[in-house]
């Protein structure tokens, strides 16, 4: 992932590296200033901030953590048994883990051996040296605020020596990049793509309402839960901004060439995450627009002195007003993301906002349908040049017409073209956010309120029971867990 110095992104370095176990090069240097202490990560999340969350209140994982915190007074690394490493990234490693006895036993637990969790472990001293500690803090602060079916649940966060640990839910289905490799032709069908893209849109919509610009959407970061629904992951590249609720009328003038009013500018703020969205909008009144007539005529001759019939007709035909609570005017100049997913405005350094998430949604959708990204070149430099200069092209898929996908594919291509508009001001979603994207014909028939009730294209098999063999880590392995590749099962201490 890539980033350049930008004050609102808390960056003070420029570094380039390739993350392990990644098929794409990453560039990233959103770090922390040298004044940020490696000990500023904080201890275990207080019980008050680990409240029951509406979407996860009945989970066995929540109940087990609640009982642990009530009995032990805190949650720490000593309460967990690490099973195996799930993956690694720029900041640290993620381990599959479960609670130790007696905390693992629960009447709500259905998994053999207790509830499974994913624990992200980062070395604070190493991140402070690389000036990237702030990124880890941003991710933690964002995770603490999230409560959405398609976003991670943070069960606990704590420190162990110079390590910071985030305990989140485990997704046994892997990620969509791996899932795509299993599909015929290594691509998803249009119907499967619609399902995953729709859930991703809802996740982005919620993030934007919370003032979070994700900036790292790609199949590798879209995980599959045990029920087959998705979960976005990795928020260390996200940008936190203010959002101001706005009531806007969709551009009925889309055909007439007009534009709806823009919301007031958003301001980027340090990630002391405080949700600014209120359920009660005060002082917001509907705007009654005068009817616009092209070329004069009888309506123009009225001069607004009619008997009100025109106003009633306008009310009947006008698009309903939409509440827009998204950082559509947020601006950042950080160079952050994965090469193949970078938006043109990020590459050019002109400054970017939440529209970059809709660009990456277009690239994400393209890769799901065609098995590759639209602008990939022979090198990273060529890829960036293609993003800036080359138009979007769509390869012909053998068997698409026979499978009855041709018309659906044309609608999907239209959506991708609008999402991949190089001018962010003309990009779908740049003005009214997710409301514009959800209205596209590609999503015709999608009941957005009941997406969670739709059967996913694939439901992963239950995770296999953990092996009985237990390995004890050496002192060196305890001190450097990020360099240790466990084979089966081990005790951390």
Swiss-Prot record:
Instruction: List GO molecular-function terms, semicolon-separated.
Output: ATP binding; protein serine kinase activity; protein serine/threonine kinase activity
Q: Where is the composition biased (Low complexity)?
A: 27-44
What reactions does this protein catalyze? Answer: L-seryl-[protein] + ATP = O-phospho-L-seryl-[protein] + ADP + H(+); L-threonyl-[protein] + ATP = O-phospho-L-threonyl-[protein] + ADP + H(+)
Biased-composition ranges for Basic and acidic residues? 474-493
Composition bias type Acidic residues, residue spans:
307-319
- Active-site residues per Swiss-Prot or TrEMBL entry: 216
Q: What ranges does the record list as Gly residues composition bias?
A: 295-306
Q: Which residues form the AGC-kinase C-terminal domain?
A: 444-493
What's its EC?
2.7.11.1
Record keywords: ATP-binding, Auxin signaling pathway, Developmental protein, Kinase, Nucleotide-binding, Serine/threonine-protein kinase, Transferase
- What family does this belong to? Belongs to the protein kinase superfamily. Ser/Thr protein kinase family.
Function text = Serine/threonine-protein kinase involved in the regulation of auxin signaling.
What is the protein's name according to its record? Protein kinase PINOID 2
Q: Cite the source lineage.
A: Eukaryota, Viridiplantae, Streptophyta, Embryophyta, Tracheophyta
